[in-house]
């Protein structure tokens, strides 16, 4: 069913429709209890498949977002089932772009924003993923359209509709001890969006933090290059080793750059475990970020050390991998 403007669900009045997904429909709403403010209301609308199991998964998503607390995650304030419509719902943060509409990374045209913004979004999305992984949650659907951009220009990770909960205590708290396993096993289907699937998921293996890292890599590869990622060899030994070697590889590549716009190096995300995949993605983002700031000239020895742009400290190696930051030699 579709709610109309003015309809009331869970103490909220519908203002407008924001969007429809596989599990539910999202509306902008305002409180009717005098609390003020506007929120997003997600209502379960699935009417096919194992509806009862999917309903429980929907509620598990809401409960999980109530428990998880991170500045780059959606926050759920209330969840329940409305007697009038007979459907479960949850009320969450309303995340709108600067223009008042819903904006995701899928709305960003490659090349339309500077790489500093992209590096910022990458850091925020990665931080959110590392947090949920530590809590025993695997997102399983990291992609451009599931990373929102708020009015402040920050990235917010959303849509936990097919998340996998690996922590035993969390599964019990969410009341998903057996239900979700049954849903996921249905027809041995692969959970997630095809273009973002890690090789192990295509083989039918379970999702892990490493597969989320792969999906994040594909997401930002697409955002940076405008093309879909295709596995390939590591270029010029890039990321062959941790530590200073990857900085040296960057310098070699940057020294040969004919202009301020450098193609993203070809990297093989499929052959790296979780920790290495984060590094691969970070280097790709860092390369373009450095170029945008003009740092490529400094790293290639074409700019005096004193002229190094301050921006390198704002979104560069320090944030990606503090332990692997190499200071320039005097």
What are these regions (language model features)?
Residues 25:
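Conserved N-lobe ATP-binding subsite of Hanks-type protein kinase domains
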Residues 45-67:
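AlphaC helix of the eukaryotic protein kinase fold
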Residues 79:
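Activation-segment/catalytic-loop signature of the eukaryotic protein kinase fold
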Residues 85-100:
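Conserved short submotifs of the Hanks-type protein kinase catalytic core
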Residues 121-122:
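Activation segment signature within eukaryotic-like protein kinase domains
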Residues 126-137:
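Protein kinase catalytic-loop region centered on the HRD/HxD motif
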């Amino acid at each position: 069913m579709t709610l109309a403007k003015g309809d009331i669900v869970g103490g909220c009045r519908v203002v407008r429709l924001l969007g429809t997904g596989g599990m539910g429909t999202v509306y902008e709403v305002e409180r009717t209890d005098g609390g003020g403010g506007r929120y997003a209301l997600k209502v379960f609308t699935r009417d096919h498949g194992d509806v009862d199991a999917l309903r429980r998964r929907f509620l598990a998503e809401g409960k999980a977002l109530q428990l998880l607390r991170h500045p780059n995650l959606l926050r759920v304030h209330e969840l329940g089932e409305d007697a009038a419509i007979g459907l479960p719902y949850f009320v969450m943060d309303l995340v709108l772009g600067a223009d008042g509409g819903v904006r995701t990374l899928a709305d960003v045209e490659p090349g339309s924003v500077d790489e500093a913004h992209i590096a910022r979004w990458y850091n925020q999305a990665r931080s959110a993923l590392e947090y949920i992984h530590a809590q025993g949650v695997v997102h399983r659907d990291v992609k451009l359209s599931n990373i929102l951009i708020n009015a402040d220009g920050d990235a917010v990770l959303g849509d936990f509709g097919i998340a996998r909960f690996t922590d035993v205590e969390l599964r019990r708290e969410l009341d998903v001890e057996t239900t979700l396993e049954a849903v996921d096993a249905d027809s041995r289907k692969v959970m997630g969006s095809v273009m973002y699937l890690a090789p192990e998921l295509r083989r039918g293996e379970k999702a892990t933090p490493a597969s989320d890292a792969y999906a994040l890599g594909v997401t930002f590869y697409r955002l940076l290059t405008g093309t879909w990622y295709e596995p390939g060899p590591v270029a010029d030994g890039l990321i062959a080793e941790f530590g200073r070697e990857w900085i040296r590889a960057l310098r070699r590549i940057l020294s040969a750059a004919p202009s301020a716009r450098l193609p993203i190096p070809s990297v093989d995300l499929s052959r790296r475990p979780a920790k290495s995949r984060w590094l691969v993605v970070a280097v790709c983002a860092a390369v373009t970020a450095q170029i945008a700031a003009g740092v490529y000239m400094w790293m290639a020895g074409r700019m005096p050390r004193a002229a190094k742009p301050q921006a390198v400290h704002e979104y560069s190696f320090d944030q990606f991998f503090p332990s692997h930051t190499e200071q320039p030699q005097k």
